[in-house]
Amino acid sequence: MFCYQCEQTAGGSGCTRVGVCGKNEDIASLQDTIIIGLKGIAAYAYHAGELGARDPEVDAFMHEALFTTLTNVDFDLNRHIETALKVGAMNLRVMELLDRAHVERFGAPEPTKVSTGTKAGPGILVTGHDLLDLYELLRQTEGTGINVYTHGEMLPAHAYPELKKFPHLVGNYGSAWQNQKKEFEDFPGAILGTTNCVLIPKESYRERMFTCGIAGLPGVTHIKNRDFTPVIEKAKSLPPLEEKAGGELTTGFHHQAVLKLAGQIIDAVKAGKIRHFFLVGGCDGAKPGRNYYTEFVEKVPKDCVVLTLGCGKYRFNHLDLGDIDGIPRLLDMGQCNNAYSALQVALALADAFKCSVNELPLSLVLSWFEQKAVAILLTLLHLGVRNIRIGPSLPAFLTPGVLKVLQEKYNLKPITTPEQDLKEILG
């Protein structure tokens, strides 16, 4: 543990074995888990709020949960576990809120093929998560001859009707956040970072990068009030992109789109044509070992379907997995917050087969990197989902004691190898 939030912290530098206040490492671990999960909720609530959607119950809970982590407030382990699970419950509410706000503003996502090539002409590359920022940029660039490209978690934007209607939203450039320094350096146009997942830029592209909203970078112009004039003018002044052919990625399998296939899916399961579903997704990152997810999906048998979301999908969304009776074997459900869609599909299947989610032929193999992923994990635990595999490593803020509780109650486990995990899951 490490805690230095009060004046009496050990040695004036930090408590590392037990708190001077009396809290042990497990309480400290759960307090960290609560705070980290609340950060994830805050991100989703911020996006929903920008679209005019708010939930007073979520706001009130955030105050209550933060209060529990103050010095000398609560030393009860079980109460801390309850609060951590309630973080998951509130994250479910806020993901639903954000999904509803996105659909009301931009329409329900629909399966869409997205080009990874480039068009001749000036371009702007948009990274992050904020669909409203992208919409405003598209509106302001209409008729300018500037093409707009998505990057990273912005890929699913192409599936929303009110965004895809802009003909100058032409494709997706690059991959996940950790590759941006190379990809942004190679992209000759202007670059806009809208939320988290920006990195301190290299000098080679700093002067043509911009941030807006919550994002900020040193030496980079910050756009206020969604007036993207400086970005547009910069794009016009830069060398145009060349026409380059690329492949295609498919996104847009929002739960509304997937549930339209529910009859086909149920029939395929009953006929033995679909043996198992895998949710393989979450965050991507630079840590070695994430090739596990590529190899895992490559080795998934042909009678299984893979659902994915978040930027972790870039490890395998280029693979052509084909289909089963017209049902794509790889279904990209969207951004990390579209974990809500995955849950809706799981609940609908459980209802159709008259069983619990844990009794479905469904396995979760998650990749995590940051705080939103922790909030989603807590949501899954709140719902009682068991047998989740997580990687590439377990969270450092979970002590052996807390991890033991999660393993005993939920059978939460680290990934091992694709071969071993598939064998254990499928038998």
From Swiss-Prot:
Protein family according to the UniProt entry: Belongs to the HCP family.
Example of a GO MF term: 4 iron, 4 sulfur cluster binding
Name under which the protein is recorded: Hydroxylamine reductase
Superkingdom field: Bacteria
A GO term from the CC aspect: cytoplasm
Cofactor note: Binds 1 [4Fe-4S] cluster. Binds 1 hybrid [4Fe-2O-2S] cluster.
Taxonomic source organism: Moorella thermoacetica (strain ATCC 39073 / JCM 9320)
Coiled coil: none
NCBIfam families membership: hybrid_clust, PRK05290.1
Reaction catalyzed: A + NH4(+) + H2O = hydroxylamine + AH2 + H(+)
Cofactor entry: [4Fe-4S] cluster; hybrid [4Fe-2O-2S] cluster
Record's keyword terms, sorted: 4Fe-4S, Cytoplasm, Iron, Iron-sulfur, Metal-binding, Oxidoreductase
The gene coding this protein: hcp
Binding site for [4Fe-4S] cluster: 3, 6, 15, 21
Annotated EC: 1.7.99.1
Protein's GO biological process: response to hydrogen peroxide
Keyword Metal-binding: yes
Residues bound to hybrid [4Fe-2O-2S] cluster: 129, 153, 197, 283, 311, 336, 370, 372
Functional description taken from the UniProt entry: Catalyzes the reduction of hydroxylamine to form NH(3) and H(2)O.
